[in-house]
């Protein structure tokens, strides 16, 4: 499965936030955007702002691919209800993101690796597709041998119970979690490492699908 393999620190510096939760914050040494003119601020066009919001959303969920953005938008654009809410939910309820939200991994990239390497179960069955969409009532757990991974243990130990979103429940002692309800847009946005104008992203995609 394709995934982003580019420089993650440059992405974090571009947006001025340690969005990937790395222990070595890339902003400590270079708190400005990358590039020769990183210290200068340029006024962006409307198109430039749309591109930036799109890139921010992709970064918040582990550098998801362009085709995944387009696919998610096509799946919700003609449905009844809030398009922006349903669109954002497509990424928040991805299996890799839920593994991260439940504290089984320190970063979204570590969560992607756990899923891809077959460490994760959904309703008791192995699922190794990172983009698998969870629905309310679905349970996420780790395989018995995977619970012994030092990285998993450390991640859960460092995760405060109060930091879990209200739309999930987590049983740390049994390495299990459950998506309780479909999260609202404001609940999802509260979990993002930086603000994203999702309506701008949807407007951008509406002209390209």
From Swiss-Prot:
Q: Which keywords does UniProt give here?
A: Ribonucleoprotein, Ribosomal protein, RNA-binding, rRNA-binding
- Cite the GO molecular-function annotations of the record: rRNA binding; structural constituent of ribosome
Example GO biological process term?
ribosomal small subunit biogenesis
Question: What PROSITE patterns is this protein classified in?
Answer: S4 (PS50889)
Annotated InterPro entries? Ribosomal_uS4, Ribosomal_uS4_bac-type, Ribosomal_uS4_N, S4_RNA-bd, S4_RNA-bd_sf
Q: Which Pfam families match?
A: Ribosomal_S4, S4
Give the matching CDD domains.
S4
A GO cellular component annotation here is: small ribosomal subunit
Q: Which domain of life does the UniProt lineage start with?
A: Bacteria
The keyword Ribosomal protein is annotated on this UniProt entry: yes
SUPFAM superfamilies attached to this UniProt entry: Alpha-L RNA-binding motif
Tell me the ranges covered by the S4 RNA-binding domain, including all copies. Answer: 93-156
Protein's job = One of the primary rRNA binding proteins, it binds directly to 16S rRNA where it nucleates assembly of the body of the 30S subunit.
Q: How does it assemble?
A: Part of the 30S ribosomal subunit. Contacts protein S5. The interaction surface between S4 and S5 is involved in control of translational fidelity.
Protein family: Belongs to the universal ribosomal protein uS4 family.
- Protein name as it appears in the record: Small ribosomal subunit protein uS4
Query: What species is this protein from?
Result: Chlamydia abortus (strain DSM 27085 / S26/3)
